[in-house]
From Swiss-Prot:
GN (gene name): aceK
Disulphide linkage map: none
Designated name of the protein: Isocitrate dehydrogenase kinase/phosphatase
E.C. numbers: 2.7.11.5, 3.1.3.-
Presence of the UniProt keyword Cytoplasm in the record: yes
Lineage: Bacteria, Pseudomonadati, Pseudomonadota, Betaproteobacteria, Burkholderiales
Compartments where located: Cytoplasm
Single GO cellular component term: cytoplasm
Family listed: Belongs to the AceK family.
GO MF entries: [isocitrate dehydrogenase (NADP+)] kinase activity; AMP binding; ATP binding; phosphoprotein phosphatase activity; protein serine/threonine kinase activity
Length: 619
C-alpha cells in the first residue's frame, strides 16, 4: 500500500520474470530439440535407403528443410510467454522489438542472457549451431539496432577447431598391413547397412583396381611402391544420403599426399547394394558437394568435426557451403555473413550493378571482389500475375526441390545493414528507383529489408558470345541437358533464354532465374495446329486458342536459335526438344511418379558402367 498525501493507492508487486540463466536454458533446450530431430532425419534416411523408399527420401528431405524455422518459432513463442509481465519486456507489454531502445535494465538482461548461454556450451557437441539458433530466436525478440556482438553471436564464442564426437568422427584403415582389398571390404561393411550386397568382394576388387589405376597416373616416376608405409584410408563414420544414393566420403594418404575420394553406393533392381563409382580428387568431390544439388542427410554428433574433415578435402569450398550441403543451412548463413563482413573490412571496391541484361523481376548487384550476387525483388514487376509473394514462393519451391545439379541454391536474408559509402552512386540511384520499399537509408548505413544471395556465374549468353567453337558446342549441349534434367525432375523453366542460365567454374550450365518456373505436371505441351488459310499463317496473331499453361515447343527455335553456331550445335544434340512429343512423354513419366537418377559423376567414374539402374516408379 502506498501513501501519497492523504490518498491511499495499491500498486501491484513487480512480477519476477525469469533469470537470464533460465532464458538461456530455454533457448538451448529449443536447439537441442531441433538437433535431435535433425539427427533422427539422417537415421531415417538410412532406413529409407535400405528399403528403397525413394519417395519417402524426397519427402524427408523437403520436411527437414522446414524443421529449423518451426523450432525457432516454437522457442520464440515459449520465450514470449515466459517473459510476459517481466522487466525484460518494454513498458507497453510488447516484446523488446516493439521499440528500438532498450532500457538500461533490459540491456543488462539480454547481455547477461548471452553470457549465460556461452557458459552452457562448454561441453556441447554442436556449439556453433546452438549459437546460430540463439541468434535466430533473439532476432525475433530484439530490434535490429541490437544485432551486434553484445547481444548476438556475430563472432563465435566457442572454438570448434579440435572438437570431435565421443566416438571419433572418422575411422582409419591400414591397407599395407592387411591388404587393400580386405581394407576396402571392412571399410564398407563397417557402415552396417541392413541390406545385402550384390557382391562386396567383387566390388571391392573393382574399387581397388580403379584406385590403384588412378594413383599410378598421379605418382611421380621412381616414387617407389604404389602403397607406401604411411598409407592410410580415413573415412567419415556416417554415410551421406541423397536421393537414391549413399556415399562414403574420405581421404587416402599415401607418400605424404592426400587424395580426397568418395565411393557411391546404389541399390540394384534386385534390392541389393552395389559399389557404383569411385570419385577421386577435389574436382570430383566439388561436383558431388555442388551448391546446385540437394542437401545431404548425414548423422553427425559433432558437425564441426565433419566440416573440418570436408574442408581438408575441398579447400576451395567455403565452410559456409559445406555446412549448407550437410543440411545445416542456417549455420551456413551465419558463416557466410561472417565471411562477408570480414571481406568488407578487408576490401575497398564498391557494390555495383551486375553485368548482363537487366531482368524484369529482380534488381541485381554485385561486389566485384566477392563471388556472389545480391538479388532484390522489384517493387513494380512488369509481368502479368507476378508479385512479391509469387516470386518468394518460387524461390522457396526451388529450396525444397531436388535441384538435380541444374539450379543454384540461394541464401535468403533480411535486415542486412551495409555501409553506404560502399555503394556506387548509380547503384544507389537504381535501388531508390526500383526497390524503394526494400531499402532504408539510415545515416551512413543502407539497410536491405530482403535479399537473395547466389553464387556468381558467367551468364550463358555472354559465355556463348565469346566462346570458341569447341567450347560453344559443349555449352550448348550442357544447356540442353540442363533443360532435360529439370523437366525430368518436374521443373519447367518457363523462360529459357540464355541470360537466365550461368556457367560454373567446371563448365556446368545452371539455371538461376526462378520467377517463371512451374511444375511440368501443370503444363500442357501442344503442337501448333495447321493454319486455316494463308492469311492466318502470315498474321502476327495466333490462329488458335492459347490457354494460360499452354506451351508450344515448336516456337522455341524462333526465340533461342538466332545465332547460326548455336543453332547447329543445338540441332545436333537436342533437336527433339523443339517438338511437343518429347515434352509430352516426359510429362507423362513425371505424372506417373517416376524418379530418375541424375548421377553427380561421369560414366567413366562408374565401376559398372553397363549397369545403369532403370528409372523408379511409384508403388
Amino acid at each position: 500500500m502506498i501513501y501519497s498525501g492523504d490518498v491511499q493507492r495499491i500498486e501491484p508487486a513487480p512480477v519476477a520474470g525469469p533469470a537470464p540463466l533460465d532464458v538461456a536454458h530455454l533457448i538451448l533446450a529449443g536447439f537441442d530439440r531441433h538437433y535431435a530431430l535433425f539427427r533422427y532425419s539422417a537415421q531415417r534416411a538410412k532406413s529409407l535407403f535400405e528399403s528403397g523408399d525413394w519417395h519417402g527420401m524426397q519427402r524427408l528431405s523437403r520436411e527437414r528443410i522446414e524443421y529449423y524455422d518451426m523450432r525457432v518459432r516454437e522457442c520464440a513463442t515459449q520465450l514470449d510467454s515466459a517473459l510476459r509481465g517481466s522487466d525484460a519486456r518494454t513498458a507497453d507489454g510488447s516484446r523488446a522489438n516493439g521499440s528500438a531502445a532498450l532500457s538500461e535494465a533490459q540491456t543488462a538482461f539480454w547481455q547477461a542472457v548471452k553470457q549465460e548461454f556461452v557458459g552452457l556450451l562448454a561441453d556441447h557437441r554442436q556449439p556453433e549451431c546452438a549459437e546460430t539458433f540463439f541468434n535466430s530466436v533473439s532476432c525475433r525478440i530484439l530490434h535490429r539496432d541490437y544485432f551486434h556482438n553484445d547481444f548476438l553471436f556475430v563472432r563465435p564464442a566457442i572454438a570448434t577447431d579440435y572438437l570431435d564426437s565421443r566416438i571419433p568422427s572418422y575411422r582409419v584403415y591400414y591397407p599395407v598391413a592387411e591388404g587393400l582389398h580386405k581394407s576396402l571390404i571392412r571399410m564398407v561393411a563397417d557402415f552396417g547397412l541392413a541390406v545385402p550386397y550384390a557382391d562386396l568382394p567383387r566390388d571391392a576388387r573393382l574399387l581397388a583396381r580403379a584406385a590403384v589405376r588412378q594413383l599410378r597416373g598421379q605418382l611421380p616416376r621412381h616414387a617407389g611402391p604404389r602403397l607406401a608405409s604411411d598409407c592410410q584410408i580415413q573415412v567419415l563414420g556416417s554415410l551421406f544420403f541423397r536421393n537414391t544414393g549413399a556415399y562414403i566420403v574420405g581421404r587416402l594418404i599415401n607418400q605424404g599426399t592426400v587424395y580426397p575420394f568418395a565411393v557411391a553406393l546404389r541399390r540394384n533392381p534386385a534390392g541389393q547394394v552395389c559399389l557404383d563409382a569411385l570419385l577421386l580428387g577435389a574436382d570430383d568431390l566439388s561436383t558431388l558437394f555442388s551448391f546446385t544439388r540437394a542437401y545431404f542427410l548425414v548423422d553427425m554428433e559433432t558437425p564441426a568435426a565433419v566440416v573440418n574433415f570436408l574442408a581438408s578435402l575441398l579447400p576451395r569450398k567455403p565452410k559456409a557451403e559445406l555446412y549448407t550441403m550437410l543440411g545445416l543451412q542456417k549455420q551456413g548463413k551465419t558463416l557466410f555473413y561472417r565471411d562477408f563482413l570480414h571481406h568488407l573490412t578487408h576490401s575497398r571496391d564498391a557494390f555495383d550493378i551486375a553485368p548482363g541484361i537487366r531482368g524484369m523481376v529482380m534488381c541485381v548487384f554485385t561486389l566485384p571482389s566477392y563471388p556472389y550476387v545480391f538479388k532484390l525483388i522489384k517493387d513494380r514487376i512488369d509481368k502479368d500475375g507476378m508479385d512479391h509473394a509469387t516470386v518468394r514462393r518460387k524461390y522457396q519451391m526451388v529450396k525444397l526441390h531436388d535441384r538435380v545439379g541444374r539450379m543454384a541454391d540461394t541464401w535468403e536474408y533480411s535486415q542486412v545493414a551495409l555501409p553506404r559509402s560502399r555503394f556506387a552512386p548509380r547503384l544507389l540511384e537504381e535501388l531508390r528507383r526500383l526497390v524503394p520499399s526494400l531499402i532504408e537509408e539510415n545515416g551512413d548505413t543502407v539497410v536491405i529489408r530482403h535479399v537473395y544471395i547466389e553464387r556468381r556465374m558467367m551468364p550463358l549468353n555472354l559465355y556463348l558470345r565469346h566462346a570458341s567453337d569447341p567450347l560453344l558446342e559443349v555449352a550448348v549441349r550442357e544447356y540442353g541437358d540442363a533443360i532435360r534434367q529439370l523437366a525430368t525432375a518436374n521443373i519447367f523453366p518457363g523462360d529459357m533464354l540464355y541470360k537466365n542460365f550461368g556457367v560454373t567454374r567446371l563448365g556446368r550450365v545452371v539455371f538461376y532465374d526462378y520467377d517463371e518456373i512451374q511444375r511440368m505436371t501443370e503444363m500442357n505441351f501442344r503442337a501448333i495446329p495447321p493454319a486455316p488459310n494463308e492469311e492466318a499463317e502470315l498474321s502476327s496473331e495466333p490462329w488458335y486458342a492459347v490457354g494460360p499453361n499452354d506451351v508450344f515447343p515448336e516456337e522455341f527455335g524462333r526465340f533461342l536459335l538466332g545465332d547460326p553456331r548455336v543453332r547447329q550445335a543445338f540441332l545436333r544434340h537436342h533437336a527433339d526438344l523443339l517438338a511437343p512429343q518429347w515434352w509430352q512423354a516426359c510429362r507423362a513419366r513425371v505424372a506417373q511418379g517416376r524418379i530418375e537418377e541424375f548421377f553427380p559423376y561421369d560414366t567413366d567414374r562408374r565401376l559398372h558402367p553397363q549397369a545403369a539402374p532403370p528409372p523408379r516408379t511409384a508403388a
